[in-house]
A protein has these predicted regions:
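Catalytic pocket-lining loop regions of alpha/beta-barrel enzymes
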Residues: 1-117
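Mid-to-C-terminal alpha-helical segments outside catalytic/metal-binding sites
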Residues: 111-116, 122-162
């Protein structure tokens, strides 16, 4: 059974599992349980997409902005651990992808088999612009049909056996 987890930066600060900058505890879990699918989610998780991710508490709880620098810890973990998946549904995932269109599209294509919409909350008042962004990228031919289908519904159907 896969697990989708929300991440926090320190105990008592916010809900979720706690990890340090660079996600060393997540890596330890990925190594220890190679047959378990971990689905990452939330700001501290997506913050690590860029090589210039700052280690301070405030930065790790932000959505991130500006160009993504190659060599981010999250990208390294995704490349090294096939049991690491990622949830794009919240604005943390959306901002990580949309903040740098070229990088975001490359990331979506490279990891299309392990990206999906999943969430840890139900809130009809929040706006999540990534869905429309993905639709537009697909319609404009910037995102392949295969990646679009997998990310939008096929991966979730497969992983959760729907």
């Amino acid at each position: 059974m896969p697990i989708l987890f929300h991440m926090s930066t320190q105990e008592g600060y916010e809900y979720g599992i706690v990890d340090e900058p660079g996600l060393p505890m997540l890596e330890e879990a990925l190594e220890k349980y190679p047959g378990l699918k971990f689905i990452g989610h939330s700001q501290p998780f997506w913050h690590e997409i860029s090589q210039d991710a700052k280690p301070d508490l405030k930065s790790r709880m932000e959505w991130g902005r500006g160009p993504v620098r190659e060599g981010g810890r999250l990208v390294c973990l995704m490349r090294n651990y096939k049991n690491l998946y990622a949830d794009l549904s919240a604005n943390s995932g959306g901002c990580a992808i949309m903040r740098d269109e070229k990088f975001g599209l490359q990331f979506l294509e490279e990891f299309q088999d392990r990206l999906m919409f999943g969430t840890d909350m139900v809130n009809t008042d929040m706006v999540f612009p990534l869905g429309e962004w993905l639709d537009r990228q697909y319609q404009e031919g910037k995102l392949s049909a295969q990646a679009y289908r997998k990310i939008c519904f096929e991966n979730a159907k497969k992983i959760f056996q729907l």
